[in-house]
Curated annotation (Swiss-Prot):
It comes from Rubrobacter xylanophilus (strain DSM 9941 / JCM 11954 / NBRC 16129 / PRD-1). GO terms for biological process: carbohydrate metabolic process; cell division; cell wall organization; lipid glycosylation; peptidoglycan biosynthetic process; regulation of cell shape. The keyword Lipoprotein does not apply. It catalyses: di-trans,octa-cis-undecaprenyl diphospho-N-acetyl-alpha-D-muramoyl-L-alanyl-D-glutamyl-meso-2,6-diaminopimeloyl-D-alanyl-D-alanine + UDP-N-acetyl-alpha-D-glucosamine = di-trans,octa-cis-undecaprenyl diphospho-[N-acetyl-alpha-D-glucosaminyl-(1->4)]-N-acetyl-alpha-D-muramoyl-L-alanyl-D-glutamyl-meso-2,6-diaminopimeloyl-D-alanyl-D-alanine + UDP + H(+). One of its GO terms (molecular function) is undecaprenyldiphospho-muramoylpentapeptide beta-N-acetylglucosaminyltransferase activity. UDP-N-acetyl-alpha-D-glucosamine binds at N102, R144, S172, Q264. Belongs to the glycosyltransferase 28 family. MurG subfamily. It is found in: Cell membrane. Its EC number is 2.4.1.227. PANTHER family: GLYCOSYLTRANSFERASE (PTHR21015:SF22), UDP-N-ACETYLGLUCOSAMINE--N-ACETYLMURAMYL-(PENTAPEPTIDE) PYROPHOSPHORYL-UNDECAPRENOL N-ACETYLGLUCOSAMINE TRANSFERASE 1 (PTHR21015). Gene3D superfamilies: Glycogen Phosphorylase B. This is UDP-N-acetylglucosamine--N-acetylmuramyl-(pentapeptide) pyrophosphoryl-undecaprenol N-acetylglucosamine transferase. Cell wall formation. Catalyzes the transfer of a GlcNAc subunit on undecaprenyl-pyrophosphoryl-MurNAc-pentapeptide (lipid intermediate I) to form undecaprenyl-pyrophosphoryl-MurNAc-(pentapeptide)GlcNAc (lipid intermediate II). GO terms for cellular component: plasma membrane.
Amino acid sequence: MAESLRERGAEVVFFGSESGLERELVPKAGFGLHALPLSGLAGGPASRARASLLFARAVVRCRALLRELRPGAVLGVGGYASAPAVAAARLLGIPTFIHEQNSVPGKVNRAAGRFAREVLVAFPDAARRFGRAVRAAHVGMPTRRQFFSASREEALRRLGLEPPVVLVFGGSGGALRINLAAAEAFRGQTPYSVVQISGRRDFPRLSSDNPRHRILEYAEDIWHHVTAADVVVIRGGAGSLFDVAAVGRAAIVVPYPHHRDNQQLLNARYFTERGAAELLPDHEVDAKTLRGRVEELLGDGERRLRMASSMRSLATPRAAEEVAERMLAAGREGTG
């Protein structure tokens, strides 16, 4: 979304948390970042009181910054880190948009959606979950264009991989159960390559004696890894699912099981019900099951092709442009 806005001549500035991944990723992408001291609302009364105080201070800080920056529009993408800027924009009458990535809206987006100019959703069903009083539209999930343009031959060459290729990716936060199962499942020799992207937290605990099993902490060029793969094992985060859809690959989805609203399970079902992915419940993940499911898909080329085609049909290549165009139009009008 930020790249689409910048290409249209807009200056893009991020507001985020001092402790979030954005502290590293946003400047690396060439965008300005105002990092705010924030804390989640988990914990006891003292922790919640501190979080509320930090939030109030962050709103005051955001209000001052927005007065200085004078943006045409503000976009909130959910989570407590986006809430102060959205609240400050509301107070100043700046047009505010919300993008909801998941099938089930989060608390911050539910609250912010009531006063947003428009709520833009990745999954069609999410629009109705905001209620009739909220103006919501399905635009899809903004996805980096590299996922749409990457070449498999180039990806295999760059990564030094021999097909077939299995990619195991737990998302930015990792996934311990999946990581441990994969490290065990693909030991010894395999007639296929395995790339396992573990995340920072789990990486020190993992190893493999399989020369075709590569374990990485992080992959900046994740689009090359998805493009190189024949089968992808992922969590049910919206970003990961739509990244795989952009490339068009058969996927085994292991939703994170501890969200109160089954957010990742519902995300995954959108794809599994359309024949684009298979569901593997988290509690069923072990080395034997994971390897069996992967090899079953690798051994059925026709099925993989059908799944890949269905997955690709669910991609939303114009989502970022849709968001950018709506924000720029609101900025030109200049009213909240």
